[in-house]
Amino acid sequence: MFINPRNVSNTFLQEPLRHSSNLTEMPVEAENVKSKTEYYNAWSEWERNAPPGNGEQREMAVSRLRDCLDRQAHELELNNLGLSSLPELPPHLESLVASCNSLTELPELPQSLKSLLVDNNNLKALSDLPPLLEYLGVSNNQLEKLPELQNSSFLKIIDVDNNSLKKLPDLPPSLEFIAAGNNQLEELPELQNLPFLTAIYADNNSLKKLPDLPLSLESIVAGNNILEELPELQNLPFLTTIYADNNLLKTLPDLPPSLEALNVRDNYLTDLPELPQSLTFLDVSENIFSGLSELPPNLYYLNASSNEIRSLCDLPPSLEELNVSNNKLIELPALPPRLERLIASFNHLAEVPELPQNLKQLHVEYNPLREFPDIPESVEDLRMNSERVVDPYEFAHETTDKLEDDVFE
């Protein structure tokens, strides 16, 4: 099982923000307002000037622009039309969605705009953002820098995943969520002064350290960087999720009591701090552990594979998935009754304890097993190879029998 950390806060990214009635409206100055005819003419000219052979659906785009203007609609959707550019936009617009096109730049954006979603384009730069903007979604572009954001006093959500950013500008105090994974970031701006920030996604960058984190934080995802240490975490009262896998960590700081998910896979850890009682998900695989201390009582997922573990502590009764493959285990403790998946391949096990009746997956290949437990009927995925056999004569006969079975199947 793998938990996608973005599911913790996926409500932020499901759709652009809608009209917010509690915000002060930004009036459009009268001298800048064009007539409907002027907009129609400008859009018709933009349609006629489409590059030949590009397959752009500018006729469809103009139809939607006219409809938006006629109805004074606050939202405009121009997804998947193959557009290489956008014309001037209706002045009353509050939400623009123009994802999955070939845009290399954006026109001047309406001052009333609150939500901008233009992911999966070819944007290399952004001009200044409208003052009322709340949502900025520009993932999967070619951005090398962002405009100044500190004065965007309504901005709540920034998604700049999968770009070429080497640095982020100072962030506004209103920010609640930032996704900046898969860039080239070497550092993050100051975060401690962001009182509403709940989630940071900065995985797959080149971060060497993290700044001090705000008290409001709930999720930090910083896997696949070059972090050698983590900042203080214990005093963050709402922190539930830490993903710091694939880094250079040798130690961890004390953990907050609110923590529910901890992924520190593929580091250089030899031990863990005291684990919070609230922890339900723990991945410490591919480290240098020789053992694990007491496990939290509500843990349902434990991956401790590819370490140097010789013995395990008692397992909590809540555990549903256990992966301890590629260790130095001689025996396993009693298995919890709710366990559904047991992966203990590549160890030194001579026997396996009694198996739970709900077990669905059992991998114990590459162990010198002398005895087999009764396999529950619930098991759907079973791997037990012939290395279990100690007697070479028995091994030879079983191998021959298996080959004959394979021939006649």
Swiss-Prot record:
A GO molecular function held by the record: metal ion binding
Entry keyword set: Calcium, Cell outer membrane, Leucine-rich repeat, Membrane, Metal-binding, Plasmid, Repeat, Secreted
Residues engaged in binding Ca(2+) 2: D266, N307, E308
Disulfides per UniProt: none
Record localization: Cell outer membrane; Secreted
SUPFAM superfamilies referenced in this protein's UniProt entry, alphabetically: L domain-like
UniProt LRR repeat ranges: 72-91, 92-113, 114-131, 132-153, 154-173, 174-195, 196-215, 216-237, 238-257, 258-279, 280-297, 298-317, 318-339, 340-357, 358-379
SMART domains according to UniProt: LRR_BAC
GO CC entries: cell outer membrane; extracellular region
Positions annotated to bind Ca(2+) 1: N246, D266, N326
Pfam families assigned: LRR_1, LRR_TTSS
Location (main, coarse): membrane
Family per record: Belongs to the LRR-containing bacterial E3 ligase family.
Subunit structure: Homotetramer forming a hollow cylinder with an inner diameter of approximately 35 angstroms.
Job of this protein: Effector proteins function to alter host cell physiology and promote bacterial survival in host tissues.
Annotated protein name in UniProt: Outer membrane protein YopM
